[in-house]
């Protein structure tokens, strides 16, 4: 549809605008090394690109800026992968180098690091715990009255909580109970644990622990964990540093949406596998109509576990963000396989 010359001019306009946030005129383009056409030719091609809807005028400048259609064409047809700096690759890989892979900790740190590397808002939707399977459970005494119950799932999710240990339960009973739980419950989906414990495990415990009723109370406290996905944000206020959002009235609804968090559950929960780019009004939420959302899913085999997303202005560094998300999802997937 577009000529080679138009493709080059469109890509140069978008690349320049992404970097400068300033409308791009023919004089700016004429100074670019890769543009060898006359100013008159550049103006004619820009007029054609505007007529086709790929670029548009602003009220305050004679230059042009990319339209949503222009950004979509750029992402679909002109984008080239960006090679990330080695120090950033090392920083990201170091995050996933720990031998014990705690999914919750990784999700929190991923959101923070991505927000720092991009200066956009990063969102990580963790796995839905109800679809996880129990890997093992530990109960670690802190003193005579309290202990920490630690639940580890097959996806690396670690859930810990402090529980009360009745005086009537001795440490040997606690150890027996943990051994029985790991023997009988390893591999059981988290959503089925409650039924399995109170229909099967309690019967087994009767023959092994002295104070049966107190042991049941410990069990009940240990496995009361939220099963829905957790969502983590990094750089919630980063949008305010973008020139497009210096008008607080313009960005107020977006900041409210980010602060409330809940709307992003529905947005991220149903993402298709792989990298997805939503630009401007392609986003379902009206508060995001001046934003782009780039998301990537991570999984083990056929099982999709979670989503990482970057929210920024439509003038986003698409190539860099996509390269970062691809690296993060590879690292998370590899970490979950450990």
From Swiss-Prot:
Organism: Bacillus cereus (strain AH187)
Molecular function terms, GO-annotated: DNA binding
GO biological process, one term: negative regulation of DNA-templated transcription
Family (UniProt): Belongs to the HrcA family.
Domain of life from the UniProt record: Bacteria
Function comment: Negative regulator of class I heat shock genes (grpE-dnaK-dnaJ and groELS operons). Prevents heat-shock induction of these operons.
Keyword Transcription: yes
Protein name from the UniProt record: Heat-inducible transcription repressor HrcA
Entry keywords, A to Z: Repressor, Stress response, Transcription, Transcription regulation
InterPro entries: GAF-like_dom_sf, HrcA, HrcA_C, WH-like_DNA-bd_sf, WH_DNA-bd_sf, WHTH_transcript_rep_HrcA_IDD
Pfam families linked to this entry: HrcA (PF01628)
Lineage: Bacteria, Bacillati, Bacillota, Bacilli, Bacillales
């Amino acid at each position: 549809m577009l000529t080679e010359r138009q493709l080059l001019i469109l890509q140069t306009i978008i690349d320049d605008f992404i970097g400068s946030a300033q409308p791009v005129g023919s004089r700016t383009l004429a100074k670019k090394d890769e543009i060898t056409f006359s100013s008159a030719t550049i103006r004619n091609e820009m007029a054609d690109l505007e007529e086709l809807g790929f670029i548009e005028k602003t009220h305050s400048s004679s230059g042009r800026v990319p339209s949503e259609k222009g950004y979509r064409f750029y992402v679909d047809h002109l984008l080239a992968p960006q090679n990330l700096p080695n120090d950033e690759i090392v920083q990201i890989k170091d995050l996933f180098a720990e031998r014990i892979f705690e999914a919750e900790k990784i999700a929190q740190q991923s959101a923070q690091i991505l927000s720092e590397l991009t200066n956009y808002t990063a969102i990580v939707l963790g796995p839905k715990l109800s679809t996880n399977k129990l890997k093992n459970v530990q109960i670690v005494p802190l003193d005579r009255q309290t202990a920490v119950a630690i639940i580890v799932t097959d996806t690396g999710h670690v859930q810990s909580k402090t529980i009360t240990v009745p005086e009537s339960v001795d440490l040997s009973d606690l150890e027996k109970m943990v051994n029985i739980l790991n023997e009988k419950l390893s591999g059981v989906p988290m959503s089925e644990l409650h039924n399995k414990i109170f229909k099967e495990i309690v019967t087994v415990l009767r023959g092994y622990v002295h104070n049966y009723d107190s042991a049941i109370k410990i069990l009940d406290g240990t496995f009361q964990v939220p099963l829905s996905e957790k969502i983590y944000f990094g750089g919630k206020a980063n949008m305010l540093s973008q020139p497009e959002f210096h008008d607080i009235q313009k960005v107020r609804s977006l900041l409210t949406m980010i602060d409330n968090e809940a709307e992003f559950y529905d947005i991220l929960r149903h993402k298709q596998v792989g990298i997805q780019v939503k630009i401007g009004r392609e986003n379902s939420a009206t508060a995001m109509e001046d934003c782009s959302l780039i998301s990537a899913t991570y999984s083990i085999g056929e099982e999709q576990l979670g989503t990482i997303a970057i929210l920024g202005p439509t003038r986003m560094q698409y190539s860099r963000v996509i390269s970062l998300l691809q690296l993060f999802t590879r690292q998370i997937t590899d970490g979950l396989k450990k």
